[in-house]
């Protein structure tokens, strides 16, 4: 599911919408590249940092260009979380230099890290209105190839906050990514070029 053996770039079709200086959210479609940056070889796999390139016609906040750090192992992919402050982390998946150096030196992963791909799926175990980070990993039905979707969102008292989706395809790797707030505010959507997806791919 993870097709990169070293650092590299993969082409994606993208669309994004962010508030401009007039308070509007113009939608922009463009082409970009996903940077799979190899950080270190650990005991059970490789640590990568995923970043997308800045759009030329739209200023995407720098913190949203990073998808975070991923520990890629033979049987699973883990998203590295430094702590459990999901609300604060919502739109910036970064690691302190201290934590990153400790991971590289010891191969020990922070306990709050989460599995975004493995063969065994899982359901959200929290009550739907619980204020916390909700997540699941499920199979996508009626697909020509084996595909898995990871979804996560932060639940507030009256509505959901930040949310994101990853879709992985066997033999290809990451084919789709989307993140934003509530009803598509400050949204980024990425689709791997050459991959066909249904128009309603972001729905369950």
Regions found by a protein language model. Give the residues of each.
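Conserved functional acidic sites
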Residues: 1-204
């Amino acid at each position: 599911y993870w097709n990169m053996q070293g650092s590299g770039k993969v082409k994606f079709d993208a669309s994004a919408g962010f508030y401009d200086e007039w308070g509007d959210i113009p939608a922009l479609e463009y082409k970009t590249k996903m940077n799979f940056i190899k950080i270190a070889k650990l005991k059970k796999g490789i640590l990568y940092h995923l970043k997308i390139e800045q759009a030329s016609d739209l200023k995407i906040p720098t913190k949203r260009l990073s998808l975070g750090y991923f520990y890629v192992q033979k049987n699973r992919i883990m998203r590295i979380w430094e702590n459990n402050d999901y609300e604060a982390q919502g739109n910036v998946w970064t690691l302190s230099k201290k934590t990153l150096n400790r991971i590289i030196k010891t191969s020990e992963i922070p306990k709050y890290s989460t599995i975004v791909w493995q063969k065994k799926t899982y359901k959200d175990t929290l009550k739907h209105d619980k204020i916390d980070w909700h997540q699941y990993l499920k199979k996508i039905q009626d697909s020509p190839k084996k595909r898995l979707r990871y979804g996560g969102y932060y639940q507030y008292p009256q509505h959901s906050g930040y949310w994101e989706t990853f879709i992985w395809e066997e033999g290809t790797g990451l084919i789709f990514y989307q993140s934003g707030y509530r009803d598509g505010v400050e949204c980024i959507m990425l689709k791997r070029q050459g991959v066909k997806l249904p128009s309603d791919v972001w729905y369950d």
